[in-house]
C-alpha cells in the first residue's frame, strides 16, 4: 500500500475527483465509456502520487494547483501503457481540466 504521508493529498484528490465522477455517472455516456474515464482517473491519482515521490517540492504546494498544472494540456506520460491508453488518458485529463475550470467559476 502507500505511505502515510500520501493519505492527505490522496484525500484531497478524491474530493476533487468525486464531483467529476458523479457527473459522468449521471451523463448519457455508455457504461463502458464511463468505466474508461474512471480507470483513467485512478491512473491520474497514481501518477500524481508518483510525482510527489519524485519531486518532494510538490508536497508544499496546494494539491489542486499541482493537479491543474499536471493536466493542463492532457495527462502526464503514463508510467505503464501504450499509445492508445495514453490517448484515452489524455482525453479524460482534458475533460477533467475543463470540468475543474467550469466549476471554479
Task: Describe every region a protein language model picked out.
Residues 29-103:
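Non-catalytic DNA-binding core/recognition domains of DNA-processing enzymes
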Residues 1-29:
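Short terminal alpha-helical segments
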Amino acid at each position: 500500500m502507500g505511505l502515510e504521508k500520501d493519505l492527505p493529498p490522496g484525500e484531497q484528490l478524491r474530493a476533487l475527483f468525486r464531483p467529476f465522477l458523479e457527473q459522468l455517472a449521471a451523463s448519457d455516456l455508455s457504461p463502458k465509456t464511463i468505466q474508461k474515464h474512471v480507470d483513467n482517473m485512478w491512473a491520474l491519482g497514481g501518477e500524481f502520487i508518483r510525482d510527489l515521490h519524485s519531486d518532494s517540492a510538490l508536497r508544499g504546494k496546494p494539491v489542486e494547483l499541482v493537479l491543474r498544472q499536471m493536466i493542463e494540456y492532457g495527462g502526464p506520460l503514463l508510467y505503464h501503457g501504450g499509445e492508445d491508453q495514453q490517448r484515452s488518458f489524455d482525453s479524460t485529463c482534458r475533460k477533467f481540466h475543463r470540468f475543474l475550470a467550469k466549476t471554479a467559476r
